[in-house]
């Protein structure tokens, strides 16, 4: 008896189609034969085969075509402008970014962002308030949404409270905006401690919410970025989730690290006299004397254990000893992580001079340009710098994102966490 056949029409992104045809040629088979193979294997309940099919190949839904031009972007929990400056700089063949609105709760931070990031986009709105008091339903729409939801309760520095802390649940306000607006993409950033908060439950809950957000869901590429591997002069590790709307049929690939590390000494070279935020941190005579016994790359505990540190300069600390206390930089390596808070001994110390770094030097390690002026007191500026995403690191990721939207190839590596097709992930 002859087999009854029927035709299935599929509409897919042109770049995905090209890649699929190239794969078929490599396997020395036809497109029709390969599609039949996928379908037959799927019917046999081998559901892993479905993950091999590019997003939307099996949905039959038309794929929206993106028009060249400026993508309107919004930032929640913007910080002083690490990502904002990267948005201003990033261009591609077809796309650029245009700020629509941003929000942060800290007044100095908002003033810094307004002065530096929005100086050429006066129509963009800066909302300076607690996000819990913001009317999400009245915020302007945007093509892209970026947010570094507060990391205080997910950080590895200090006690990690995760979703049970005061700030752990604030990611949900971003999800609320995505649900309402359905932007083309989102960029979500948090500290490396996110994966272990609440025994991993925090990350799973956030991933579930973002993967299933909006009308179409978002195909998410989740990766732990070690920015020092991308030429940033600082060991700074951040989870970044790039989500592309499910109906677009595209998946973000993690850009390949440069493999070139930039030393902190190179980064701090030739700071111009006119650059703002260069006021020296006042060091007591006791602190200067203590630093004189600490060698390049060492912390106070190592100096103490070596027997070099006199008794009157030792710290009477019980319990856990943080490795960054009075730790000098190693001039031949990237700096250790620049933080935004902490008491005595946590200010990042010069490799040879008996002093802490200036805020401008700390900003250099975060790759802020020298003409970027932070607003506020010395401690306020320190906090702003320490909470930011490195400008150059964000730009590398945003450039890859635009290439993804354009369908252009670039060198990439497998994500450390994984790729989650739209509306497929559920918290266990």
Regions found by a protein language model. Name each.
Residues 1-14, 21-29:
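Short Lys/Arg-rich basic patches
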Residues 114, 240-244, 339:
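Short, well-ordered beta-strand micro-motif
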């Amino acid at each position: 008896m002859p087999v009854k056949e029927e035709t299935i029409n599929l509409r897919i992104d042109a770049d995905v189609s090209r890649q699929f045809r190239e794969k078929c040629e490599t396997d020395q088979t036809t497109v029709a034969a390969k599609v039949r193979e996928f379908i037959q294997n799927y019917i046999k309940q081998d559901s892993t085969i479905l993950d091999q099919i590019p997003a939307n190949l099996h949905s039959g839904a038309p794929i929206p075509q993106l028009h060249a031009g400026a993508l309107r972007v919004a930032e929640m929990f913007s910080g002083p402008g690490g990502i904002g400056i990267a948005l201003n700089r990033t261009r591609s063949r077809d796309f650029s970014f245009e700020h629509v609105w941003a929000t942060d709760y800290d007044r100095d931070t908002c003033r810094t962002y307004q002065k530096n990031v929005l100086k050429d986009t006066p129509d963009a709105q800066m909302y300076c308030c607690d996000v819990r008091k913001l009317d999400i339903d009245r915020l302007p729409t945007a093509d892209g949404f970026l947010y570094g939801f507060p990391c205080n309760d997910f950080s590895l520095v200090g006690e990690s409270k995760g979703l049970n802390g005061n700030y752990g649940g604030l990611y949900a306000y971003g999800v609320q905006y995505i649900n309402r607006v359905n932007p083309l993409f989102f960029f979500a950033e948090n500290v490396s401690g996110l994966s272990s908060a609440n025994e991993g439950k925090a990350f799973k809950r956030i991933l579930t919410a973002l993967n299933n957000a909006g009308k179409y869901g978002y195909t998410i590429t989740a990766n732990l970025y070690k920015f020092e591997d991308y030429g940033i002069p600082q060991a700074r590790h951040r989870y970044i989730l790039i989500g592309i709307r499910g109906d677009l049929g595209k998946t973000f690939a993690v850009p390949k690290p440069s493999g070139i590390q930039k030393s902190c000494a190179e980064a701090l070279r030739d700071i111009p006299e006119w650059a703002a935020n260069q006021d020296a941190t006042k060091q007591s005579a006791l602190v200067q004397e203590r630093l004189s016994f600490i060698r390049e790359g060492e912390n106070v505990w190592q100096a103490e254990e070596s027997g070099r540190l006199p008794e009157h300069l030792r710290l009477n600390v019980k319990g856990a000893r943080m490795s960054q206390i009075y730790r000098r930089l190693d001039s031949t390596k990237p700096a250790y992580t620049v933080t935004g808070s902490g008491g005595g001994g946590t200010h990042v110390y010069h490799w040879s001079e008996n002093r802490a770094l200036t805020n401008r030097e700390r900003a250099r390690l975060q790759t802020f340009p020298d003409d970027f002026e932070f607003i506020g007191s010395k401690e306020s500026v320190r906090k702003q710098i320490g909470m930011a995403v490195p400008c150059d690191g964000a730009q590398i990721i945003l450039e890859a994102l635009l290439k993804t939207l354009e369908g252009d190839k670039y060198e990439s590596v497998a994500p450390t966490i994984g790729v989650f097709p739209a509306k497929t992930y559920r918290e266990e």
